[in-house]
Amino acid sequence: MGKGSKQITHSEWASGDSYSASAGAGGGKGGDNAPFKRLPFNFCSLSLQPFAHPVCTPSGTIFDLTNILPWIKKHGKNPVDGTPLKNSDLIKLNIAKNESGDYVDPVTYKVLTDNTHIVALRNTGNVFAWDTVERLNIKGKLWRDLVTDEEFGRKDIITLQDPQNIESRNLSSFNYLKEGESVPGQKEEESNVNASALGSSAKILKAKEAVAKARSERAQRADSSAVTKKADGSTTTSTQSKTASFQSGKPTPYNAAKYTTGMAAASFTSTGLTPHTSAELALLSDEEYMLKRGRVKQKGYARISTTSGDINLELQTEYAPKAVWNFIKLAKKGYYKDVTFHRNIKGFMIQGGDPSGTGRGGESIWGKYFNDEFEGPLKHDSRGTLSMANKGKNTNSSQFFIAYRALPHLNNKHTIFGHVIDDPTPSSTTLNNLETHPVNSSTNRPTPDIRITDVTIFVDPFEEFLNQKKAEEASGKNKKVDPTEEDRETQQEDDDQVTWTGKRVRGPGSTAAGGDAGSGVGKYLKAALANQTTQEEDEIVEFVDEEPEPEPMRKKFKSRGGFGDFSSWD
């Protein structure tokens, strides 16, 4: 303040110094005097938005998986406290919800709020209220997870939110905010990041951008097709009105088939059926609807935990939906737990997924073989490729393998359904440990065994897709409109494969889903040949073809011209 003046000058007001009442406008912007801003417990500590796929660090900081993976790839540290952080340190959280969609304690169903003391168990990832764990586990001396019944210790309890320690959720103390580092989710800052320099983790960002772009393009095509529909002549309008008269005014379900139930035709030709005058579309099951190639474009993410380290995987749902569905469903029901890798060849691949550990067992989630999926751009062109093992055409079950190098001779022989998203080069820790693991020279079996401790699914693309479709149907956004170009192609393809009775036509050498593989002309001959083949191949297990060695060049003998002297004749 000036001499003899009761007013604060401009320089004093703008000053960052804080001295009692003379604190300037910038006095509370940093340091110990920074204003307290609390982050809600259901928000990602990096994007500052509600999380969809929650994971936490051993210290209890919660992030969204799709945000923290690119950050770790670029910075290699915890954005909140600046400590070193790796992908393997992240713990997937399982938070229960009630019917209203609120996060609750899975035992007491008490709603978790910003004032609830919340903890998680390190070995299972289940989230509880502290009161529940203290009363039922600690005081009751029952050191087992109340949901999965797995044993845990006191050191496995991770505090996610403590109302008595408000500084742990204080935004003003977050390291990356104080240092002004880039935050994923802000478009203006993402534009300054070279996505190609992020390596394999940039695939997550590209996938999110591709999904958003595809949605906007579909919306634009739907709008343009609606305008074109209105501009068409009266002939098109009358034809569509006649077609619509056979169907009810209800919105068409998202899983409606391109053919009817056939009840109208059946009741017309049979007096034993109740008459039906409407042509109702048949409904596909959720599995049948989603397992069409190209239907679900979102990628899945999983982690295989082994005794030699963790392997993070990106699953290609768009090009191999059946293989991804099979892998995710088997992993979720614990099929791969304690399963060994029974074959490991250095410079070639490592194979596992057989619970018997012999290479002869294993079955798919359907209990039978499923067909190969070769359509698409995926090739065995790099180290870290994840593919299905088989013993011939359309004989995929539960066994899979991870390539140690490019294997072009396996293209169109084994279905590719994923890739290792960690550093796949020979310098990477886990793949290098697996490749250099000692094996039996005669059987190529690892000694000692390499065991799969667990397979964790971080992102289930089918579950996400189904929830989105059901939400759209509930909100009435799925009303029947003029089909887009993609829908027309799908409808044309289905019309070519389905008769007017709704029976699917099987192509040569293929079997319809859910059909009897032995039906049709020559089924007994095929069964006999199959039995003969089975007897001949009792010693053949599920295998991956090794690269054939090139045939040696034949020596060319230079023939002598003319006749000999007949000296070799008797």
Curated annotation (Swiss-Prot):
UniProt main location, coarse: nucleus
Domain U-box: 37-110
Keywords: Isomerase, Nucleus, Rotamase, Transferase, Ubl conjugation pathway
Comp. bias (Low complexity): 234-248
Catalytic activity reported: [protein]-peptidylproline (omega=180) = [protein]-peptidylproline (omega=0); S-ubiquitinyl-[E2 ubiquitin-conjugating enzyme]-L-cysteine + [acceptor protein]-L-lysine = [E2 ubiquitin-conjugating enzyme]-L-cysteine + N(6)-ubiquitinyl-[acceptor protein]-L-lysine
Transferase is among the record's keywords: yes
UniProt-listed CDD domains: RING-Ubox_PPIL2
GO BP annotation list: protein folding; protein polyubiquitination
Region (Disordered), start-end ranges: 215-253, 428-449, 469-570
Sequence ranges of Acidic residues compositional bias: 484-497, 535-550
Residue stretches spanning the membrane: none
Start and end residues of each PPIase cyclophilin-type domain: 298-457
Gene3D superfamilies in the record: Cyclophilin-like (2.40.100.10), Zinc/RING finger domain, C3HC4 (zinc finger) (3.30.40.10)
Biased composition (Basic and acidic residues): 469-483
Compartments, as annotated in UniProt: Nucleus
Domain of life: Eukaryota
A GO CC term attached to the entry: catalytic step 2 spliceosome
Pfam families (alphabetical): Pro_isomerase (PF00160)
GO molecular function: peptidyl-prolyl cis-trans isomerase activity; ubiquitin protein ligase activity
Compositional bias (Polar residues): 428-446
EC number, UniProt record: 2.3.2.27, 5.2.1.8
UniProt cross-references to SMART domains, sorted A to Z: Ubox (SM00504)
InterPro entries, per database record: Cyclophilin-like_dom_sf (IPR029000), Cyclophilin-type_PPIase_CS (IPR020892), Cyclophilin-type_PPIase_dom (IPR002130), Cyclophilin_A-like (IPR044666), PPIL2_U-box_dom (IPR026951), Ubox_domain (IPR003613), Znf_RING/FYVE/PHD (IPR013083)
Family: Belongs to the cyclophilin-type PPIase family. PPIL2 subfamily.
Function as written in the Swiss-Prot or TrEMBL entry: May catalyze the cis-trans isomerization of proline imidic peptide bonds in oligopeptides thereby assisting the folding of proteins. May also function as a chaperone, playing a role in intracellular transport of proteins. May also have a protein ubiquitin ligase activity acting as an E3 ubiquitin protein ligase or as a ubiquitin-ubiquitin ligase promoting elongation of ubiquitin chains on proteins.
Record-given protein name: Peptidyl-prolyl cis-trans isomerase-like 2
